[in-house]
Amino acid sequence: ALSRVVGLFSARGYNIETLTVAPTEDATLSRMTIVTTGSDDVIEQITKHLNRLIEVVKVVDLTEGANIDSVFMLIKVRGVSKEREEMKRTADIFRGCISDVTEKSYTIELTGNKGKLDAFIDSIERTAILETVRTGGSGIGRGERILKV
């Protein structure tokens, strides 16, 4: 199913900003969370094309209702002398977890929506960033809104 979905996006010239695939509570199904952009008409076309794929069981646009979305990021930052305490304090403010410490760096784990992670990056000096990696977004409807097949 993954190759068919990616092939559809590629063939039609649609852009995938992020893509996350993981098992669900049903061992026979995986859940794909795709983040893409486009006008309402483009999103409608993407949804129609996805629904036509045999491997696709259901398509839900999470932006059509209340939802929770989250991204995971690991960021390695320089941490020497006075920078160390500042990095630790900034990580604490954003509820990050320091998962690795060396004499010259910290690796910080952060989760949250894209805006929160971007705000963290904006709050530290760009020259302090040594390396960054992010997952694609994952999302789920709020409250009683569930994806059931």
Regions found by a protein language model. Name each.
Residues 1-30, 35-149:
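Long, contiguous binding/interaction regions
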